Amino acid sequence: TGARVWVNVEGDAGTPYFRDSYGASSLTDISYAVQQVNFSTNFSNSNYCFVSGARAGSSGGGGRVVIGYDQPATSYFKYQMRNLGNNNEHVDAACLSFFGDM
C-alpha cells in the first residue's frame, strides 16, 4: 500500500503551510521551526512509520537538516527541523510521508 498521509510543507515562510498534501487536515505552527501535521483520519495506533526529507531554508544550517519529533499520536505528528548544530531551523521544504493502518 502507498502512503496513508503525505505532506510537502513550505517552512521558510512567516507561517508554514502545505504546498500540497494528502490525508492531512491541517498544519499547526507550534513555535519556531516546530509544526504539527494533523491527520484527516486517525491511525489505528501510534506505531506507524514515517519518512522525511528537507531542504535548508534562508536561516542557514549549511544545507543539512534533520528531523526531531515527539512521541507520535494517532491523530497528529509533531516535528521540528534541526541543523547539524542541533538548533531548530526553518526549512524551504519539508516532505513527510506516513505509512500504517488506519
Which stretches of residues belong to each language-model region?
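Terminal beta-strand-rich extracellular "head" domains
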Residues: N45-Q71
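Extracellular receptor-binding modules and their adjoining Ser/Thr/Gly/Asp/Asn-rich linkers
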Residues: T1-N45, Y76-M102
